Amino acid sequence: MVLAHDWLTGMRGGERVLSLICEQFPQAKLHTLIHKQGAVDENIARQVVATSFLQHLPGISRWYRYALPLFPYAIEHMRPPEADLIISTSHCVAKGLPTHAPAKHLCYCFTPMRYAWVFYEEYFGKNPAKKWLLGLILNYLRDWDKQTAEHVTRFVAISHHIRKRIEKYYGREADVVYPPVDVNRLFITGKSPQRFDLIVSALVPYKRIDLAIKAYNQSKFPLKIVGTGTEYRALRSVAKQNIEFLGWQSDDSIRALYQQCRCLVFPGEEDFGIVPVEAQACGRPVVAYAKGGALETIVDGQTGVFFHEQTPDALNEAVQQCAAIEWDQERIRKNAERFSNEEFLIGLAQAIRRTLTM
């Protein structure tokens, strides 16, 4: 077996999925564009890791995102060993790893290439002077993305939301296996919530933390924000005193914040969204934008409240509705258990069997 992953520069949601797969298949060689030493957990670090030529560029782990147009070439020129099965975990180019016939290729797809289809303006910017260059790059990336999709034996999507995106952009059907959430390390304390709401997120444009700040600037209710990112300074500069930025926090600290908060606020559109599931595993409701993966992980009125327009007023109204409900923490927790590590492994095993028999 061979594994493929876009890059190894930190432990985010995709790497948590990869970690569990590596734990199941410790002998599989792992192919990736870039590997930043010390950036991943023991399960991944124990694998034999092969990297692309990009690994040898000075300081690449800091500026690799600017090398996006080189990614297709880099992955296509990697040389995996012969194997019966390739499993790629991909949101960019990992699914383009060359496959030797008669090997089967199972792609666990976080999304069709995010930077080419959905969030390209957030990635490339909106500078009109660069529009012609952006058009050339997008056409190239989209053509490559569709062509390499044809070499995948079977797609597995992280949500029904992404299944529809795979069908739209690739013309391919996909199974759905939800990503694993380690709900066993999360639990209900039984204590009443403290007087603050919570955001746990990377501070980047598409997460829409700016919307939450505008809403809480108006309401003046305490809001704690966990996370770092490119928008940190800009967001902090417009936030009022009731909004506290906590920066990076350990898993244990985040768990305590989940357990203490009044609710989790999730203002952006996500492909799946692990954070809302983690908060629910601690018995806390979620206020979320009614689009994307949140529609599959949150039960409106039972484990959270949706808002349907990305405006401060709509968000504040949903928060007020959430505060007025007497929540059943055990019921909220039960919903989160649908997304456990065990459920993921069962779904993955079924997908592997189906792939090998195609």
Q: Where are the language model's segments positioned?
A:
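A charged, aromatic-enriched C-terminal amphipathic alpha-helix characteristic of glycosyltransferases
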Residues: 310, 323-354
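Membrane-proximal helix-turn-helix segments that form the acceptor-binding/catalytic region
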Residues: 125-155, 163
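Conserved donor-binding/catalytic core segment of Leloir-type glycosyltransferases
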Residues: 183, 187-207, 211-224
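Conserved acidic donor-binding segment of nucleotide-sugar-dependent glycosyltransferases
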Residues: 247, 300-301, 305-312, 319-326
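Acidic donor-binding loop of glycosyltransferase active sites
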Residues: 259-271, 284
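Short hydrophobic beta-strand element within catalytic cores of glycosyltransferases
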Residues: 265, 285-289, 298
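Nucleotide-activated donor-binding/catalytic signature segment of Leloir-type glycosyltransferases, i.e.
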Residues: 233-256
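Active-site donor-binding segments of glycosyltransferases and PAPS-dependent sulfotransferases
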Residues: 27-95
